[in-house]
């Protein structure tokens, strides 16, 4: 029993130390100047939203996959076709790069930032016809989001690209976001699908989106 307790103590201490190093690297890189890491969401008006320099990260650990975060921070590439909250400026992909160690440390720190609204949904990413029909026809998600079809990037420019969503997004977060996007982004053009789609349809759509390559 003592060995179990000691093992837990050392594991918890290591995890805490790792998170501490990640927070230090996060602060040293100046990430807090653009990214909110304490929830809940603060913007209340369009003016508030437009004042943001980058996406909030207070639920990063619920939204992203750690492997993606570490790789992206070391070699960042545009996720949004357009600059953050811009309809006219193309995203030039000028996000600062971190060293391999700092990227891993910051990714570990960000993965500890969880949103209680994101529950274990049990959803598995998968190609499914019902989800595809909702995405392509019923809601025309292509209008705002890019996807890759037969090796070609197609779709709208106003929202983040969903090409590569399978490597990037947690299906639990996708489901929570589709169900109640205002929790994460109070000022948003994204529809509240809880009043449009059934729970089963939201799950089908979340499984489909989180499987997009």
Tell me the role of every PLM-derived stretch.
Residues 46-62, 74-104, 122, 155-163, ...:
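Axial heme c-ligation environment in periplasmic c-type cytochrome domains
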């Amino acid at each position: 029993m003592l060995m179990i307790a000691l093992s837990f103590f050392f594991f918890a201490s290591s995890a805490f130390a790792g998170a501490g190093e990640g927070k230090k690297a996060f602060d040293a890189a100046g990430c807090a100047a653009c990214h909110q890491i304490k929830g809940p969401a603060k913007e209340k008006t369009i003016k508030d939203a437009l004042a943001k320099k980058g996406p909030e990260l207070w639920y990063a650990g619920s939204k992203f996959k750690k492997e993606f975060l570490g790789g992206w921070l070391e070699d960042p590439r545009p996720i949004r076709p357009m600059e953050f909250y811009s309809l006219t400026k193309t995203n030039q992909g000028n996000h600062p790069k971190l060293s391999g160690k700092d990227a891993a440390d910051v990714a570990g720190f960000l993965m500890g930032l969880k949103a209680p609204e994101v529950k274990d949904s049990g959803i598995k990413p998968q190609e499914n016809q019902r989800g595809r029909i909702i995405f392509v026809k019923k809601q025309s998600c292509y209008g705002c989001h890019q996807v890759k079809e037969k090796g070609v990037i197609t779709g709208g420019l106003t929202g983040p690209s969903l090409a590569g969503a399978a490597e990037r997004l947690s299906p639990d977060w996708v489901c929570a976001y589709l169900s109640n996007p205002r929790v994460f982004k109070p000022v948003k053009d994204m529809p509240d699908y809880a009043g449009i789609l059934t729970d089963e349809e939201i799950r089908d759509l979340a499984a489909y989106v989180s499987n997009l390559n």
